[in-house]
Design a protein with these regions (language model features):
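Periplasmic alpha-helical coiled-coil/stalk elements that build and connect Gram-negative outer-membrane
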Residues: 29, 134-248, 350-353, 357, ...
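A short glycine-centered flexible hinge/capping loop motif at secondary-structure junctions
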Residues: 177-181, 382-386, 423
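Bacterial Sec-pathway N-terminal export signals of envelope proteins
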Residues: 8-70, 74, 223-262, 311-312, ...
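Small/polar, glycine/serine/threonine/aspartate-rich low-complexity segments that form flexible
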Residues: 16-27, 72-105, 116, 229-239, ...
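Long amphipathic alpha-helical coiled-coil segments
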Residues: 214-222, 272, 419-429
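Sec/SRP-type N-terminal targeting helices
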Residues: 46-50, 54, 63-64, 93, ...
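Bacterial N-terminal signal peptides
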Residues: 1-9
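Metallo-beta-lactamase
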Residues: 204, 254, 409
Length: 435
């Protein structure tokens, strides 16, 4: 019996050591490094950064139209065959050169410049909120992949321990059958448990390989990566109350900030369209020079033009554009109101999700201790012939379930915390990001 038990233990240990040796060769990434690398590679975040840059240039343009006129420079050279009258030399010339400088300033645009200034400010605010939203969305996905690797490693450990326990129990069961202390079905039940434990180990190892590849792809690696272990101590509580979290999310949460900015931008666009119903006044200064060579200096003329235009009829194009702007404004308002009505629900779901997961993790830790002691007692009783194989197997399965539930509860706590941080747009525990 001792020889059989030793052989099964060596076989199980050898099976467990082979994947461990392969894992040692994988590159290791910390959570802070994974967040930094994944955020820079996320297409949505790159697009959000680009939107901030675009909105900043639009804001500069909206400011400068109040201060600086638009300037354009134009020149052309013409060869005439036969010679043609040249306004610069006042005689027929084969070549004529013209240069022109134009300065244009909009004196009155029906409020469109002011509306564009408001729209650009709202668009810039919305772009910053979108950048923050994209950053935390990428971080949430990265943390999900990171925790999946860590949880997968612990679940593989649980599955390996189950295989080792099943192998040990099979050796004990066979010895009891040989000695006549147990019936043949005991060893059959234990062999079935060993097969099922090995199947579960294969499934968990497969899931872990996929999780490592997913994390590697997320952080820009060419293959699988290993996640550096985290502090096993979970946060005991959140540093703010539920009401404070709701208020903060409504004021500074990226989703809600972006919705308000979108509404302001849509309202400004609607006002800009209204400006097309008012007259526009433009002051234009033009300097023109003529000659038969570059740079023309023979004749110079200067023009100063004040133009006033009043659009009367354009086949309902203004009305169509105004209707579209009004619809966009109404949709943006409805979207903002919907988000504001749901802010308490969203924050409460994330807040209570964290507290629930944290409590479940504490309960699961106690369940593991109870299940481990129960298995130890049932194992001793079975070896003494005081209980049945079914009671032993049930105790072993309960231990496996309790250990797996603890792993899932611990990382569910971290993931729900990341979800709440994404809603608020800030880290609640900044020191934990740098590990």
């Amino acid at each position: 019996m001792l020889a059989l038990l030793a052989a099964l233990q060596l076989q199980a240990a050898g099976t467990a050591q082979l994947p461990a040796l392969l894992e040692d060769s994988l590159p290791v990434v910390t959570l802070a490094d994974a967040l930094r690398r994944a955020t820079g590679l996320d297409p949505n975040y790159v697009a959000a950064i680009g939107q901030v840059d675009n909105a900043a240039w639009a804001r500069r343009s909206a400011f400068t139209v109040f201060l600086v006129p638009a300037v354009s420079v134009e020149t052309d050279a013409t060869k005439n065959l036969p010679a043609f009258f040249n306004f610069g030399t006042l005689k027929p010339e084969t070549y004529s050169v013209q240069a022109q400088v134009t300065l244009r300033y909009d004196l009155f645009t029906g409020g469109q410049k002011v509306a564009e200034l408001s729209r650009s400010a709202a668009a810039l605010d919305g772009a910053h909120a979108g950048e923050l939203q994209a950053r935390f969305a990428a971080a949430l996905l990265t943390e999900q992949n990171y925790y999946a690797v860590l949880a997968g490693e612990e679940l593989v450990r649980v599955a390996r321990e189950r295989v080792q326990r099943a192998a040990q129990q099979l050796a004990v069961g066979r010895a009891r059958v040989v000695s006549g202390a147990a019936v043949q079905t005991d060893s059959l039940q234990l062999r079935l448990e060993l097969s099922q434990a090995r199947e579960e180990l294969l499934r968990q190892e497969f899931a872990l390989r996929v999780s490592r590849l997913t994390l590697g792809s997320r952080v820009g690696a060419g293959g699988p990566v290993e996640a550096a272990p985290l502090d096993s101590v979970l946060p005991t509580g959140l540093p703010l109350t539920l009401d404070a979290a709701v208020e903060e999310a409504a004021l500074r949460g990226p989703d809600y900030r972006r919705a308000r900015a979108t509404e302001r931008a849509a309202a400004a666009s609607y006002r800009w369209r209204l400006g097309s119903y008012l007259p526009h006044a433009t002051l234009t200064g033009t300097g023109i020079a003529f000659d038969n060579r570059f740079y023309p200096t023979s004749r110079k003329f200067t023009q100063l033009t004040l133009a006033v235009s009043f659009p009367v009829w354009d086949n309902f194009q203004r009305e169509n554009a105004l209707s579209q702007a009004r619809v966009n404004r109404d949709v943006a308002r409805a979207t903002r109101e919907t988000l504001e009505r749901s802010v308490r629900r969203d924050v409460t779901a994330a807040y209570d999700g964290f507290t629930t997961a944290r409590t479940v993790a504490d309960i699961s830790a106690g369940d593991v201790a109870v299940a481990r002691e129960n298995f130890r007692v049932q194992q001793s009783r079975y070896r003494a012939g005081a209980t049945t194989i079914l009671d032993l197997l049930e105790a072993q399965l309960r231990l496996v379930d309790a250990e797996a539930a603890l792993v899932q509860a611990r990382y569910a706590t971290r993931l729900t915390l990341a979800g709440l941080e994404a809603i608020l747009g800030r880290r609640l525990f900044p020191e934990q990001e740098v590990r």
